[in-house]
Amino acid sequence: FTAWQRGTAFRAGANNDDSCTASRWVLLSDGNDIVDVVRSAGDVDSSFYSIGLDVETVDKKFGIVQIIENINTGALGGKGNTPVSLSFKAKVSGGGKLDNVKAAVIAWSGTADSVTSDVVSAWNAEGTAPTLATNWTYENTAANLSVTTSFADYKIENISVDTSSTNNVAVFIWSDVTDTDAGDFLYITDVQLEPGATANDFKRETHTTTLSQ
């Protein structure tokens, strides 16, 4: 989360559901003004920044998604043949209620790059994964990652992207909690999706390289 070209905070209108925020990440939420998005400190040993999701409207699910362009999906290997692995760092703070964070790789089988960026059709009850919009499919079964108040590495490995006619792939990370307090925070950084059955250390790029992409 080194590139914040659109600003370093997204609040009051700029934080609505399906709003583009930092580094091409799209904010998703069960309604508008559910969380503010702010540039926050990353992990002390590596990450300069993280994305901070600050609860404004309580008892609603929220998350972020990044959609990979069709031309770049080839870097993930042969669709249906090469597994992919997702890794990232996360932590929470606040009243201790953000205790169910999940992540998934999802696939788009509609027209290449003509994606529905609001990938959630229905957020559903706590503990039940959101229903995805038409043409989006979960490629792994999302489980509670038990995120704590300290940054830690989370890995979901050996994911088979086997949806027929996959044209785009996305990473979706969300809070699956419907009992939150105002001021609860979810911090996420160092998100990496790569080909292979295991996740490797995060590959750091210069700020200039990130901005050029």
Question: Which residues does each PLM region occupy?
Answer:
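Extracellular and organelle-lumenal recognition/adhesion modules and their flexible linkers in secreted
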Residues: T2-Q213
